[in-house]
Structure formats: C-alpha cells, structure tokens
Amino acid sequence: MEKGKVVLAYSGGLDTSVEIAWLKNKGYDVIACCIDVGEGKDLEAIKEKGLKVGAVESIVIDAKHEFAEEYVLPALQGHAYYENKYPLVSALSRPLIVKKLVEVAKEHGATAIAHGCTGKGNDQVRFEVGIHALVPEMKIEDPIRDLHWSREEEIEYAKENGIPVPISKKSPYSIDENLWGRANECGILEDPWQSAPADAYDRTVALEDTPDTPDVIEITFDKGVPTKLDGEELPLEELIMKLDKLAGKHGIGRIDHVENRLVGIKSREVYECPAATVLLAAHKDMEDLTHERDLAHFKPIIEQKLSELIYNGLWFSPLMDAIQAFLAETQKVVNGVVRVKLFKGNVICEGRKSPNSLYSEELATYTSADQFDQEAAAGFIKLWGLPTQVYAEVMQQNEKNNK
C-alpha cells in the first residue's frame, strides 16, 4: 500500500541502510538525507549508497557553517557543559539535523520522518521532540527501536534485500562526531572500571606522546564570537577545525564521563573535544575580564539550564529562545584577545586584553600608584556587616533574657 514519502536521517551505515529497505517494503518512497555537521565522512559515497539500497532520492546537505554559527556558538557563549563535564557534542547537532529533515520533508511533501535511534538512548527523544516542536502533525517512524532486531537478524534482512553487509570486523564502539567533538561508547567502555584503550581515541594524542614544547596561541573575540586565530580571520567552522588539530596534538580535550541519560540510566562515554575545550576556556577568561560581578555570578545559573535543555532535546522551546536572548545581551562586551598556552593536556590562559576590560590596574595595585580609597573601606564594612551584627546582638540579648 502506498504510504507517500518518508525522509530518513541517513548515515550510510548498516542500520539506516536496512531502514531504507524496511520503509520501502512498508510502502514508502524513501528520501535518504545525510546532514554534514563535520563528521569527515565520504559524503558522495553515502549519497550513492542511499540510492543503491533503494531510496528514490538521496540528499547530502553541507550544514557545517550553520552548525557552527547557530548551534555551536550559543553553546560556547553559554559555556554549555552537561553535568559540568560534557560539552554536548552529539546533543548539539541533533536540533540542526531535525531542522534540516523537516525542511526536506516540507519541500518534498513527505508524510513522515524516520530515524534510526535505539529505544534506550537520548537521541530518540531529541529527534521526536524536536520534530513535533516544528511540525506537530508529522508521523515518525523508528524501525530500529520498534523491531528490536538483533545484529544477526539485521544482517539476514539486509542480505534478503540486497543490501551490502560489511565483511570487515565490526568496531566494538558506537561513535558519533561533528565539528565540536567526538563521542564514543560501547565495547569495553561499558565497564566504567576499565581504562579506555588507545583505539577508543582518534582526535587526541596520548599525554605521554604529546610534544615537550608548548604552543602559545591568541584567540580574538568580537561580541563573544571567536573570529581570529593568531591574527588570522577565519569562518567559525574553519577556526574550530584548525584549532581542533592543534589542541588534539597536545592531548587536550579527553573526557571520560559517567553521565545521567534522560531515559533514566547511567552511561559511560568517552569524548574528545580539543577545540571546544580551548575555546570554552578562552571565552570564559574573556568574560571574566569584561563582565560586571553580578552578571558574572548569575550567568552560570543560566548556563546550567542551557546545557540541560540541549541535552534533553528541548532546543525548540520558549525557554531556549529566552536564554538565547539573554546570552546575546551578555556578549556585547566580550571583545578582545586571549593568549593561551597548550601543553600536555592543559589549556592555560596566560594573558588577556580588551577595550571593555573592567580591570583597573590603578585600583588593583599595591604600589604607590594605588588609587583605591582605603578610607572608604571602614564605612563599607560596617554597613555590609550590619544585618549579621544586629542578628548577633538580638540572639545574645535573648540568651541573657532566658537565663
């Protein structure tokens, strides 16, 4: 029975290739859609494979620039670390992928969108909540979750439908990567006591193999946007890719994390985020120089909520819109240059300057050039401590009265 068109989030792997056949057999015309957010895959080969295994159309969308400008940048400016450790690699790309799938579905008049997420991960939530936030009436198909196939059953179905089955040894890991980093799980990593083996890493060098000489770089920010690396102006996605290689060489950005998944279980993940680690540290350093105290102390509260919204698949929500408006306001003064040393896994911000700097050497110095009015301190201290002083006096008087 004809069911119309379905847009499939297609990766080129066995899972989503099998999905093409399954959806086709169910009566759909399948449009395979691969969104490039910086994975480094052979996109032309993926496009051709989609057609070969039965899609009526196979589309590849280069979304690296949009990913950097519209998704990575707010996460950078909002210092988005889930559980104060994970800079949201996979979670950050999902809303953009959802947005592109919806755009393709509307353009082609599709009646459904399909993905290949398992029933115990976070991505099923991110995809489906995101899709319905943009198109509430859209039908969603998820054969991988709904069929509960074993690997053997999946391979058998692939053979029956003429889908090429990988003959090489399957990697024990489940890997997802983009501009902002690389996420790795499964295999030996499922035992949180076991150290991640060398083959679990790809973007970073082991500390014992890193150079014995540091690299010192300068990152320029314009309204919170990193615009230059060592004086060279670059589009954000290119700056990230260039910095990723440089920082990875020094073993920067390895994160071994047991995190709380949205679906209620704990999961051990190994992340590599060289560029993200450096940029987040440098951006925070520039904010420390340019943000007034109350703003500096309040912003982390918003940052925590931002990271939770991204992780939990609520990018397309009123609260996210409000948080992004807040972040935009905070970035107006985040202008200047941060000097950073990269060495043996460490990111050391060792210099910073800004036309919006709130640091006054004349007020901070302990030399004869000091302009701080120390005589004002006594009155300030008296008024600042007055509430606690009054409280103590009342408590003492009550104790005397009760004797």
From Swiss-Prot:
Positions contributing to L-citrulline binding: 86, 122, 126, 174, 259, 271
MF (Gene Ontology): argininosuccinate synthase activity; ATP binding
EC supergroup of this enzyme: ligase
Keywords, sorted A to Z: Amino-acid biosynthesis, Arginine biosynthesis, ATP-binding, Cytoplasm, Ligase, Nucleotide-binding
Pathway: Amino-acid biosynthesis; L-arginine biosynthesis; L-arginine from L-ornithine and carbamoyl phosphate: step 2/3
Record: residues binding L-aspartate: 118, 122-123
Main location: cytoplasm
NCBIfam families xref list: argG, PRK00509.1
Description of how the protein assembles with itself and partners: Homotetramer.
Family statement drawn from the similarity comment of this UniProt entry: Belongs to the argininosuccinate synthase family. Type 1 subfamily.
UniProt protein name: Argininosuccinate synthase
Organism: Ligilactobacillus salivarius (strain UCC118) (Lactobacillus salivarius)
Gene expressing this chain: argG
